[in-house]
C-alpha cells in the first residue's frame, strides 16, 4: 500500500493569501489549503478546498513546471537551477515558456552565490538520470556558466575509436 507523501509548508505572509501565492516561483508551489480545511488532506474533497489561483493542480496532473509570472528568474536567479532540480526530483517537464524564460535569464546566474549554485547543482547530480539534466542545463545555457571549463570541449573531435566528441564523451 502506497501512502501519499505531503509537505506542509507553514509560512507567515503579509497581505492576502492570493498576494502571497503570486510571489511564489512555480504554479505547483503556489497553492494553499486553508487551515480550517486541514481535515481535507485525507479526503476526496481535498482538491475542491485548495486555493489554486495559478492552476497548479492542473500542472501537477500534467507533470509540468510553469512559472507563476515572467519575472521569477529576475526576482531570484537561483530559481534557474531550482527549476531543473525540481524537474529532476519530480520527473516533471518544464513548459515551453518557462524554458524560454530560463534560457533568456541564464546570464543572471552570475548573481547567485557559489553556495546556492553548489547546493542546487549537487542536488541535480544526485538525481537518477543526472546526465539528462546536465543536458537540460546545457540547453538552458547554464552548465558552462557553472563549469566554464567544459565549454572548450564542445565540438572537439576525438580519434575514430571514440563515438562521441569530447563534450558528449564528458557527459556520458
Label the model's feature ranges.
Residues 1-172:
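Catalytic cores of the polymerase beta-like nucleotidyltransferase superfamily
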Amino acid at each position: 500500500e502506497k501512502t501519499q507523501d505531503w509537505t506542509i509548508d507553514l509560512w507567515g505572509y503579509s497581505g492576502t493569501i492570493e498576494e502571497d501565492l503570486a510571489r511564489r516561483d512555480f504554479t505547483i508551489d503556489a497553492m494553499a489549503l486553508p487551515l480550517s480545511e486541514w481535515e481535507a488532506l485525507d479526503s476526496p474533497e481535498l482538491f475542491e478546498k485548495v486555493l489554486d489561483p495559478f492552476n497548479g493542480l492542473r500542472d501537477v496532473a500534467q507533470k509540468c513546471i510553469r512559472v507563476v509570472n515572467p519575472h521569477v528568474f529576475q526576482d531570484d536567479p537561483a530559481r534557474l537551477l531550482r527549476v531543473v532540480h525540481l524537474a529532476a526530483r519530480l520527473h516533471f517537464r518544464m513548459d515551453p515558456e518557462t524554458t524560454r524564460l530560463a534560457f533568456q535569464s541564464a546570464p543572471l546566474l552570475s548573481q547567485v552565490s557559489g553556495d546556492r549554485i553548489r547546493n542546487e547543482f549537487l542536488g541535480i547530480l544526485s538525481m537518477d538520470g543526472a546526465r539528462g539534466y546536465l543536458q537540460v542545463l546545457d540547453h538552458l545555457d547554464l552548465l558552462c556558466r557553472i563549469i566554464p571549463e567544459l565549454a572548450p570541449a564542445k565540438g572537439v573531435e576525438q580519434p575514430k575509436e571514440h563515438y562521441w566528441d569530447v563534450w558528449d564523451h564528458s557527459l556520458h
